[in-house]
Amino acid sequence: QAFNRSNFQQEIHELFYDLVVFGTAALFVDMDKDGLRFNARHIAEICISENAQGEVDTVYRKFEMTARAMAQRFGLENLPDVAKKDFEKDPYKKHKVVHAVYPRGESKGGVGKQKAVASLYYHGDTLQELGEGGFDSFPFMVPRFVKDSVSTYGRSPSMNALPDVKMLNKMSEVTI
Protein backbone atom coordinates (compact mmCIF):
# COMPACT_ATOMS: atom_id res chain seq x y z
CA GLN A 1 0.00 0.00 0.00
CA ALA A 2 2.86 2.39 0.73
CA PHE A 3 4.02 1.95 -2.85
CA ASN A 4 0.53 2.72 -4.19
CA ARG A 5 0.33 5.93 -2.11
CA SER A 6 3.72 7.11 -3.35
CA ASN A 7 4.49 9.35 -6.32
CA PHE A 8 6.07 6.46 -8.26
CA GLN A 9 3.68 6.72 -11.22
CA GLN A 10 4.64 10.34 -11.92
CA GLU A 11 8.39 9.83 -11.55
CA ILE A 12 8.83 6.58 -13.47
CA HIS A 13 7.85 8.30 -16.74
CA GLU A 14 10.68 10.81 -16.32
CA LEU A 15 13.08 7.96 -15.59
CA PHE A 16 12.09 6.10 -18.78
CA TYR A 17 12.37 9.28 -20.84
CA ASP A 18 15.91 9.95 -19.57
CA LEU A 19 16.86 6.30 -20.06
CA VAL A 20 15.77 6.23 -23.71
CA VAL A 21 17.15 9.67 -24.58
CA PHE A 22 20.43 9.65 -22.63
CA GLY A 23 21.08 5.97 -21.91
CA THR A 24 21.46 6.51 -18.16
CA ALA A 25 18.80 7.56 -15.67
CA ALA A 26 18.56 8.01 -11.92
CA LEU A 27 15.67 7.57 -9.48
CA PHE A 28 16.16 8.58 -5.84
CA VAL A 29 14.02 6.71 -3.30
CA ASP A 30 13.51 8.09 0.20
CA MET A 31 11.00 8.03 3.03
CA ASP A 32 9.18 11.12 4.23
CA LYS A 33 6.29 11.64 6.65
CA ASP A 34 3.84 10.38 4.01
CA GLY A 35 5.80 7.23 3.11
CA LEU A 36 7.88 6.40 0.06
CA ARG A 37 9.04 9.33 -2.05
CA PHE A 38 10.51 8.90 -5.54
CA ASN A 39 12.48 11.58 -7.34
CA ALA A 40 13.77 11.24 -10.92
CA ARG A 41 17.05 13.12 -11.26
CA HIS A 42 18.31 14.43 -14.60
CA ILE A 43 21.57 12.90 -15.76
CA ALA A 44 23.13 16.38 -16.06
CA GLU A 45 22.95 16.67 -12.25
CA ILE A 46 24.78 13.48 -11.36
CA CYS A 47 28.14 11.72 -11.55
CA ILE A 48 28.16 7.99 -10.86
CA SER A 49 30.73 5.36 -9.95
CA GLU A 50 30.56 1.57 -9.86
CA ASN A 51 31.81 -1.00 -7.37
CA ALA A 52 33.86 -4.10 -8.32
CA GLN A 53 30.68 -5.90 -9.42
CA GLY A 54 29.74 -3.17 -11.89
CA GLU A 55 26.85 -1.87 -9.75
CA VAL A 56 26.42 1.85 -9.23
CA ASP A 57 27.14 2.47 -5.55
CA THR A 58 28.21 6.13 -5.56
CA VAL A 59 26.34 9.22 -6.77
CA TYR A 60 27.45 12.83 -6.56
CA ARG A 61 24.64 15.19 -7.41
CA LYS A 62 24.99 18.95 -7.99
CA PHE A 63 21.76 20.93 -8.07
CA GLU A 64 20.18 24.20 -6.94
CA MET A 65 17.90 24.98 -4.00
CA THR A 66 16.39 28.26 -2.89
CA ALA A 67 17.52 29.67 0.45
CA ARG A 68 13.99 29.04 1.71
CA ALA A 69 14.03 25.37 0.68
CA MET A 70 17.49 24.93 2.22
CA ALA A 71 16.27 26.36 5.53
CA GLN A 72 13.25 24.02 5.45
CA ARG A 73 15.37 20.97 4.61
CA PHE A 74 18.50 21.54 6.74
CA GLY A 75 17.48 24.16 9.31
CA LEU A 76 18.46 27.83 9.19
CA GLU A 77 21.18 27.29 11.82
CA ASN A 78 23.03 24.85 9.50
CA LEU A 79 23.22 27.22 6.51
CA PRO A 80 26.30 29.29 5.63
CA ASP A 81 26.09 33.02 6.28
CA VAL A 82 25.45 33.85 2.62
CA ALA A 83 22.39 31.58 2.54
CA LYS A 84 21.13 32.94 5.88
CA LYS A 85 21.32 36.49 4.48
CA ASP A 86 19.48 35.42 1.36
CA PHE A 87 16.84 33.69 3.48
CA GLU A 88 16.11 37.05 5.15
CA LYS A 89 16.37 39.30 2.06
CA ASP A 90 15.65 37.10 -0.97
CA PRO A 91 14.38 33.66 0.12
CA TYR A 92 13.94 32.51 -3.49
CA LYS A 93 17.56 33.10 -4.49
CA LYS A 94 19.11 29.83 -5.60
CA HIS A 95 22.24 28.24 -4.19
CA LYS A 96 24.30 25.34 -5.45
CA VAL A 97 24.10 22.19 -3.32
CA VAL A 98 26.15 18.99 -3.61
CA HIS A 99 24.69 15.69 -2.40
CA ALA A 100 27.18 12.84 -2.00
CA VAL A 101 25.86 9.30 -1.52
CA TYR A 102 28.45 6.53 -1.14
CA PRO A 103 29.17 3.34 0.85
CA ARG A 104 30.77 3.89 4.26
CA GLY A 105 33.06 0.92 3.83
CA GLU A 106 32.73 -1.84 6.36
CA SER A 107 29.84 -0.29 8.31
CA LYS A 108 27.29 -2.92 9.24
CA GLY A 109 24.53 -0.44 9.89
CA GLY A 110 23.22 1.61 12.76
CA VAL A 111 21.47 4.94 12.92
CA GLY A 112 22.18 8.21 11.13
CA LYS A 113 25.91 8.59 10.56
CA GLN A 114 26.52 4.89 11.26
CA LYS A 115 24.32 3.61 8.44
CA ALA A 116 25.91 1.55 5.66
CA VAL A 117 25.45 4.26 3.00
CA ALA A 118 26.55 7.85 3.71
CA SER A 119 24.46 10.84 2.63
CA LEU A 120 26.15 14.24 2.89
CA TYR A 121 24.91 17.61 1.70
CA TYR A 122 27.29 20.55 1.13
CA HIS A 123 26.77 24.15 0.07
CA GLY A 124 28.24 24.26 -3.44
CA ASP A 125 30.12 27.56 -3.08
CA THR A 126 31.28 27.59 0.55
CA LEU A 127 31.62 23.78 0.88
CA GLN A 128 30.04 24.05 4.32
CA GLU A 129 28.34 20.84 5.38
CA LEU A 130 24.57 21.29 5.47
CA GLY A 131 23.60 17.88 6.78
CA GLU A 132 24.78 14.31 7.17
CA GLY A 133 22.80 11.13 7.44
CA GLY A 134 22.67 7.74 5.90
CA PHE A 135 20.69 4.90 4.41
CA ASP A 136 20.52 1.18 5.11
CA SER A 137 20.85 0.48 1.38
CA PHE A 138 21.77 2.53 -1.68
CA PRO A 139 18.84 4.94 -2.35
CA PHE A 140 19.43 5.51 -6.07
CA MET A 141 18.26 3.27 -8.88
CA VAL A 142 20.53 3.95 -11.85
CA PRO A 143 19.50 1.90 -14.90
CA ARG A 144 21.63 2.03 -18.03
CA PHE A 145 20.02 1.19 -21.39
CA VAL A 146 23.04 -0.47 -23.04
CA LYS A 147 26.43 -0.50 -21.35
CA ASP A 148 29.72 -1.96 -22.49
CA SER A 149 32.24 -3.47 -20.10
CA VAL A 150 34.53 -0.43 -19.99
CA SER A 151 31.89 2.28 -19.58
CA THR A 152 30.16 3.49 -16.46
CA TYR A 153 27.41 5.36 -18.29
CA GLY A 154 24.91 3.78 -20.65
CA ARG A 155 24.21 4.38 -24.32
CA SER A 156 20.74 5.12 -25.61
CA PRO A 157 19.01 4.08 -28.83
CA SER A 158 19.03 7.75 -29.85
CA MET A 159 22.83 7.58 -30.06
CA ASN A 160 22.47 5.09 -32.92
CA ALA A 161 20.25 7.54 -34.80
CA LEU A 162 22.40 10.61 -34.09
CA PRO A 163 24.66 10.31 -37.20
CA ASP A 164 21.59 10.07 -39.46
CA VAL A 165 19.96 13.05 -37.74
CA LYS A 166 23.12 15.13 -38.21
CA MET A 167 23.32 14.14 -41.88
CA LEU A 168 19.66 15.06 -42.47
CA ASN A 169 20.21 18.42 -40.77
CA LYS A 170 23.19 19.13 -43.05
CA MET A 171 21.20 18.07 -46.11
CA SER A 172 18.36 20.42 -45.19
CA GLU A 173 20.85 23.30 -44.76
CA VAL A 174 22.24 22.68 -48.23
CA THR A 175 18.86 22.44 -49.94
CA ILE A 176 17.41 25.52 -48.25
Where do the protein language model's features map onto the residues?
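Extended alpha-helical, oligomerization-prone segments that build pores/tubes and scaffolds
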Residues: Q1-I176
